[in-house]
Structures are given as C-alpha cells and as structure tokens.
C-alpha cells in the first residue's frame, strides 16, 4: 500500500503558488508557503489508500488538475511532475556572477541550462532523459507518464524519444499520451492508465519472484 499526505493533483492545483513564487516578491508569497507547510505537518495520510504504483508525470503544458486526478483515480500516485511549468525543474539556485545584473543572470541561466525540448542537440536531449530518470529514482517511481498536448511539436518529438530511450537506457516503463489541452477523452485515457498501472504491478511481481529465485 502507498500512503501519502499530499497527492499529485493537489500539487497541480498548488502549482499556481509555484508559478507565483517565481515572479512574486518574497514577502507576499512566504505566508502562503508557510501555511501550506504547516498544513502538511498536521495532515493525516489517507486511511484507505487507492494507490498501487508511483509515477512521474512529464510533458508539455498541463494546468488541468483533473488530468492528474484521472491518473490517480486509476491507482497511480503522481510523486513528481516535470512539465513546462510544473514543480520540476525550476528550483535550482541561479548564480549572479560578478558584474552581472539579476536580469542577465536569469537570462543566461535559462539559455544555458534549459531542459525545454526546443534544444535539439544530442547532449541536451541526453541530459533531459537523464534528468527524468534521476527524478524517477529520487522519488522511487515505478514508471513515467509522458504527455504532450496536440499540436505541441516539440513535446511530440520528445515524447517519441522518451518512449524509446527511457525503457532502453534507464529501465523505466513509459506510458505515452497525446491529449487535447482540455481533457475530452477521459474514458480512453482511463483505459490507458489502468493498463499501465497493471503492467507496472506485473513488473513488480516478476521482479520479486526473480529476487526470490535468484
């Protein structure tokens, strides 16, 4: 059983705070962040957890909490999100070098360290795959769901590459999803997510049996 005090869909809703914290003066946003932290300290874990596996959600723009709720209703707890303006990346420290303005430091940081799929160099692509693999390892995820909004060409190509490279090079199962910006095919998506959860459960059972026999 997987228990948690904070589910991925709540993180998706809270990403409004995440976005504001990047552009809002600290004195305005800190009270809300402290309030969220205190709430988590006293919150009890779910009495009857519905989650059977852990997944990382990666992909293009996603500001629809219902999409994450749909994933979690199928038994997959979203333990980390890595989409265009999700929780990850974006929390790394930006160094202001000597003689550099804050604006220039921010611009340099995003140009040099961006993990946006618009950067097509092989080294940048490899770095993005490794980043997702590292996040999955850190949060003990069983697999990755990679989504792209229809007509988002950058993530359409990236999603195909992730589907091949993450399982082959990092041993991470991937569920590849193309979706509308507004979710209108919940029935089809639910079937895909349920099948993915079942495949992850089978993989975990096989690994346990292999460990016993080994």
Stretches found by the model and what they are:
Residues 7, 74, 169-172:
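Short, structured coil segments at secondary-structure junctions
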Residues 11-12:
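Active-site loops and adjacent core secondary-structure elements that bind or stabilize anionic groups
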Residues 136, 140-146:
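Proline-aspartate-enriched helix->loop->beta-strand connector
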């Amino acid at each position: 059983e997987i228990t948690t005090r904070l589910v991925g869909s709540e993180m998706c809703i809270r990403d409004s705070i995440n976005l504001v914290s990047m552009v809002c003066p600290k004195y305005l946003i800190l009270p809300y962040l402290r309030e969220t932290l205190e709430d988590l300290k006293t919150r009890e874990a779910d009495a009857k957890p519905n989650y059977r596996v852990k997944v990382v959600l990666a992909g293009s723009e996603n500001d629809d909490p219902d999409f994450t709720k749909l994933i979690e209703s199928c038994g997959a707890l979203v333990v980390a999100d890595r989409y265009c303006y999700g929780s990850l990346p974006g929390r790394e420290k930006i160094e202001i070098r000597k003689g550099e303005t804050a604006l220039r430091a921010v611009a340099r940081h995003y140009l040099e360290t961006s993990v946006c799929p618009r950067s097509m160099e092989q080294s940048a692509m490899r770095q993005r795959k490794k980043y997702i693999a590292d996040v999955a390892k850190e949060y003990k995820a069983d697999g990755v769901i990679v989504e792209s909004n229809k007509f988002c060409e950058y993530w359409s190509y990236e999603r195909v590459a992730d589907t091949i490279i993450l399982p082959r090079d990092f041993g991470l199962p991937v569920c590849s999803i193309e979706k509308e910006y507004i979710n209108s095919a919940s029935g089809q998506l639910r079937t895909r997510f349920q099948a993915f959860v079942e495949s992850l459960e089978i993989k975990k059972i096989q690994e346990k049996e292999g460990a016993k026999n080994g």
